Regions:
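Bacterial N-terminal signal peptides
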Residues: 9-19
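Periplasmic-binding protein-like
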Residues: 68, 143-152, 239-277, 281, ...
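N-terminal hydrophobic or amphipathic helices and topogenic motifs
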Residues: 21-105, 289-333
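Pocket-flanking alpha-helical
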Residues: 98-133, 231-236
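Alpha-to-beta junction loops
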Residues: 111-120, 133-134, 170-172, 217-226
């Protein structure tokens, strides 16, 4: 069963009623890579290993679930209702929704042991993996087998902007510094095209993809780099009329939101959670109604599927530190 309403859940969540266990450092650790000092990666798959000592595992009676704040969290609580019921049935646990208001808040919640299952946006996934012990398990898959989305640069249909070069001197909405399609990828890709954000055009952080999109619709911004999937869902919900926006540029695909678990959940519980994802039937579900292009949850590999995202982040000078996470939190909010 699941526990409404969102406001009450948020209060309970914040005062720490959710059962949590402190993250324990793996010691000694011969291989860590980019992971925070509290984690270890002995098997070399780039994600945190489960603690060898079962005393370091957390097995709460209530599992807390969150979805990336690409839009208002309230939009998705109802959409994930069917899935959370399915998750409760397969795990035998109570499921509580956590309405994360920023990427940083979501990462910090898992790092502190207060969040156990999450859908994390593509860009922040690397922060969640390295700072919070997040282990990506599945992603939403289309009928054609793809799990990706693209970076789209959108502008109003009446705008004179036709190319990336036309962004010079304009007011452009970026999402937040941790967003792959909303900031990190544009900075790397646009510079290669001869246009440097902050130098050639004014960057205005909107905080969320929907804010950027509606800002362009309402002509508060001249353009915005955003995730194609968010544009598609908002148009399908009637948030703006077809033809209102024009796509100036579209990238090759990136992996979409990673769904996964805290690294220190017991192995049998992690397996039950994975099975809840892969056995969920999107047909006639609220989740299927919201994500109309999705057929199922499919297994993923952070090491493989996030290779290009990590490359762009490294080339952009991104480092996965608590200090940078705090900066992202302030920007995102």
């Amino acid at each position: 069963m699941r526990t409404p309403p969102a406001a009450f859940q948020a209060i309970v969540f914040l005062i720490g009623v959710a059962v949590a266990a402190p993250a324990l450092a793996q010691s000694p650790c011969a291989k860590r890579g980019d992971l925070d000092a509290r984690y270890c990666d002995e098997d070399g798959n780039l994600v945190a290993d489960r603690p060898k000592d079962p005393k370091g595992w957390q097995n709460p009676s209530t599992l807390v679930f969150s979805y990336t704040p690409v839009e208002d969290p309230a939009v998705y609580e109802n959409a994930f209702a069917d899935f959370m019921e399915h998750l409760a049935k397969l795990t035998g646990k109570r499921i509580r929704w956590f309405p994360a208001e920023s990427y940083a808040a979501q990462v910090e919640a898992m790092r502190s042991g207060r969040l156990h299952i999450a859908g994390v946006a593509s860009g922040p996934t690397a922060f969640a993996v390295n700072l919070a012990g997040f282990v990506p398990v599945v992603a939403m898959q289309r009928a054609d087998g793809s799990i990706g989305y693209t970076l789209q640069v959108i502008t109003h249909r009446d705008s004179a902007i036709k190319t990336i070069a036309d962004l010079r001197g304009k007011r452009v909405a970026h999402v937040s510094p941790s967003s792959n399609s909303g900031d990190i990828a544009p900075r790397a890709l646009f510079k290669a095209m001869g246009v440097e954000p902050d130098k050639d055009y004014k960057v205005l952080y909107s905080g969320k993809h929907d804010n950027s999109i509606m800002g362009v619709v309402n002509r508060d911004y001249d353009a915005a780099p955003v995730a194609s999937t968010v544009v598609e869902r908002m148009q399908a919900r009637g948030m703006f009329k077809p033809g209102t926006l024009r796509v100036v540029y579209e990238s090759t695909p990136f992996p979409r939101t990673a769904f996964g678990v805290a690294h220190n959940l017991p192995p049998d519980l992690q397996e039950k959670i994975k099975q809840a994802f892969v056995t969920f039937d999107f047909r006639k579900s609220k989740l299927g109604a919201e994500f109309k292009d999705v057929e199922r949850f499919a297994p993923i590999s952070y090491q493989e599927h996030w290779r290009d995202v990590r490359t762009i982040q490294k080339a952009s000078g991104v480092s996965y530190t608590q200090e940078n996470l705090n900066k992202l939190g302030r920007k995102a909010e």
